[in-house]
Design a protein with these regions (language model features):
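Sequence/structural signature of beta-propeller modules
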Residues: 1-36, 394
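Surface-exposed loop and turn segments in beta-propeller and other repeat-based domains
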Residues: 19-47, 88-111, 151-174, 213-236, ...
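Signature of short aromatic-glycine-proline-rich micro-motifs recurring in repeat-based ectodomains
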Residues: 42-59, 107-124, 169-187, 232-249, ...
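Beta-rich catalytic cores
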Residues: 53, 89, 114-117, 134, ...
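Conserved beta-propeller blade signature
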Residues: 65-68, 127-130, 190-193, 252-255, ...
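Short loop/turn segments immediately following the C-termini of beta-strands
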Residues: 71-72, 81, 133-134, 143, ...
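Short loop/turn segments immediately following beta-strands, especially the blade-tip
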Residues: 79-87, 142-150, 204-213, 266-278, ...
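Blade-level signature of beta-propeller repeat domains, shared across WD40, Kelch, NHL, RCC1
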Residues: 324, 367-394
């Protein structure tokens, strides 16, 4: 549905601007998190119904289960089935001894069932993968957890479950080391990890089967031992500054390069080290890196710290985090293409949290961090509002 807008124009803003709604105009189908839809957001004590800055969520199938990275509470929350009402309490917890405690690694040392700033999460084979960012590792469950504090089966980035040093304590990085791995994705047997602090994406050609297994190839760096932002040079078609979310759009790899304020899109799935992408969205060329293309206000072709990316129906959707909105593109994409779709703001030139810096409602967003999809449901980690939204597509 195309909606003509009549707005008070900001500088260089068209008086009439149109866009397509990416998600249902009725707002979120389900809101998870304790506050009501009109309440002010405050940090929340841990419980089965509260979250603090969630950054990722995965609905495994339309009927569930649902797993959420409750990032600020250093835990995963699990629902056995797709939640059916707002504020529905979680059934399972991983990372803390109970629903009412918090702390990195449960205020202890790293274990196979503890977490420190969990961020990325995805279904992985028959199980689950989680970017356990501040433990500098990725945890893999070979089967979906079905109980509290189920331990992971495999760890990547560390030699075992009991260490958590950056790059295993070394100055340089390597194929088996990590620094703040924020994003994870599994596609056609391959595991992709946004090794954010090392400014790269690591790829395993098959699902790893042993602890500390090295990646097969790297994107964003010339080789496995480099870790400089943008490969030590200016932004390019191959370099990254702060890679985060990952998705597949029409069989093409997409990486949300938040630090360069862009989405990188490859021609197909790259299979070799440092393969350059085909084009970017959010910048007019490969060399651009400024947020909102150097402007204070966003536009329909600019981004500001896009941390998340997902695909649903016909849409490629970016969680344009610092602009507190979702923006979407459809077919025939090219360098710097203008977005057609918008959710979370009234027009493309607005970036206010919850539309007007006020309280949240079913249609508003505040620093949406992670985004994923399952059939016709888009799952948004609305981090600034301490909640997760299950939102139906158009």
């Amino acid at each position: 549905m195309e909606i003509p807008l009549k707005i008070n124009p900001l500088p260089n803003t068209p008086i009439d601007e149109s866009f397509l709604n990416i998600l249902s105009l009725e707002g979120s189908d389900i809101i998870l998190g304790e506050q009501t839809s009109e309440s002010l957001v405050i940090p929340l004590e841990p419980s089965p119904t509260t979250m603090f800055g969630p950054r990722g969520a995965c609905l495994v199938s339309e009927t569930g289960p649902l797993w959420v990275c409750d990032t600020g509470h250093h835990r995963l929350l699990g629902w056995k089935h797709r939640p059916e009402r707002d504020g529905q309490p979680a059934d399972w917890i991983i990372g803390q001894p109970n629903f009412y405690q918090e702390g990195q690694n449960a205020k202890g040392t790293p274990q196979a069932n503890t977490l420190s700033v969990p961020t990325g999460i995805c279904a992985c084979g028959e199980g689950l993968a989680v970017g356990d960012a501040w433990n500098h590792r990725v945890l893999i469950w070979q089967k979906l957890p079905q109980d509290n504090n189920t331990p992971a089966d495999i760890v990547l980035g560390q030699a075992d479950f009991h260490h958590n040093q950056v790059n295993r304590g070394e100055t340089d990085t390597a194929a088996e080391r990590m620094h703040w791995p924020y994003g994870v994705m599994y596609y056609q047997g391959k595991l992709f990890v946004a090794d954010t602090g090392n400014r790269r994406v690591l790829v395993w050609n098959q699902l790893p089967t042993c602890n500390g297994q090295p990646a097969d190839y790297v994107l964003g760096q010339p080789d496995m031992n480099r870790r400089d932002e943008n490969g030590g040079d200016s932004p390019s078609a191959a370099s990254m500054r702060w890679p985060h979310g990952l998705a597949i759009w029409q069989n093409n790899l997409v990486v949300a390069d938040a630090g360069n304020n862009r989405l990188m899109i490859w021609d197909g799935i790259p299979t070799k080290n440092n393969t350059p992408c085909q084009f970017v969205l959010g910048q007019e060329n490969f060399e651009g890196a400024e947020l909102n293309r150097g402007g204070y206000f966003p536009t329909s072709n600019a981004l500001s710290m896009p941390y998340g990316v997902a695909v649903t129906n016909q849409w490629l959707i970016a969680a344009d985090t610092a602009n507190s909105r979702l923006v979407g593109w459809k077919n025939n994409l090219s360098m710097g293409a203008t977005a057609e779709g918008l959710t979370g703001q009234s027009h493309f030139r607005s970036k206010s949290e919850n539309r007007s810096y006020g309280s949240c409602d079913r249609n508003s967003l505040s620093w949406p961090y992670g985004i994923s999809s399952c059939d016709n449901t888009v799952i948004v980690a609305d981090s600034g509002n301490n909640r997760v939204l299950l939102w139906l597509g158009k």
